[in-house]
Amino acid sequence: MRGASEPDGDNSDPLALSTPLPLTLHPAAVYLSGLAPKSRRTMRHALNTIAQLLTNGACDAMTLDWSKLRYQHTAAIRAAFMDKYAPTTANRMLAALRRVLKEARRLKQIDPEDYDSAVDIKGIQHTPLLHGRALSEQEVVALIEACLNDPNLTGLRDVAMISILMAGLRRSEVVALDFSDFDPKTGGLKVRRGKGLRDRMAYLPTGALAALSDWLAIRGDEPGPLLYPVDKAGQIARRRLTDQAVMFVLQKRGLQGNVEPFSPHDFRRTFISDLLESGADVITVSRLAGHSDPATTAKYDMRGEVAKQQAVARLKMPYRQRRDSNAPQA
């Protein structure tokens, strides 16, 4: 069997690798190695798509010689993506392309001038409609009541889960939490290797802290996942929940609470919108959400026109009405 970076022996495409590269010297492999597993799969697929597009299917991400790419290649990729993909998807794939070329430059495989021109392609501009929504306070109450009306242990577990989601965590981050990641003194949760492999601290407000404490009184303080599955017999199963289990729980509680359809990620939108509504600055909110760029955080703001009106209303204009209210005479 050939190595991951070894090209086919009969691959004569001019952009194909002529000889195998060690993974430590392969720009695509170096780039992918720095990503979280989920992002790695997504970006590997993007790079495979780019390689196949450039070589009519002759190469994939590991058999393409990325150091041979020039502006004419990257410009052609951008043009093809504009026709084939939604702008968000196309820009994500172009970002992967730029990052691989950057690794090729760092590895001294591409001339700096050739690199500068190859990556000098603009992102695809678009004004996307807002996806998702923020949950209202009444909807959150309905979800919690649906959990509390469940006499089984799943009710307490699910309230704890929703409380953690309301602190802005992604569902993958929720199921990855361990008991040792929770600090009851501060209400802090250590989110390890979140998106982009970044660690951060999240914090639970008082009500959420009480909900988690009630679950922990049942769970106990032994090491392991913070949230456990509960089987049909009502017994705790000492293993980690899955992402899909979180989705199932939310769908179930949403139906029980007569809440309009929502996604797990809508809790992050709610968290960010509520914090901004409370007057928190966007830098602090972006850190709590685990965003490296505050511009990403701003995209989660679902407050709409009312928030803009209220923000302007807080501005002070140093004007006082004239004592003589009559219109000035000509």
Regions found by a protein language model. Give the residues of each.
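Conserved catalytic core of the tyrosine transesterase superfamily
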Residues: 1-330
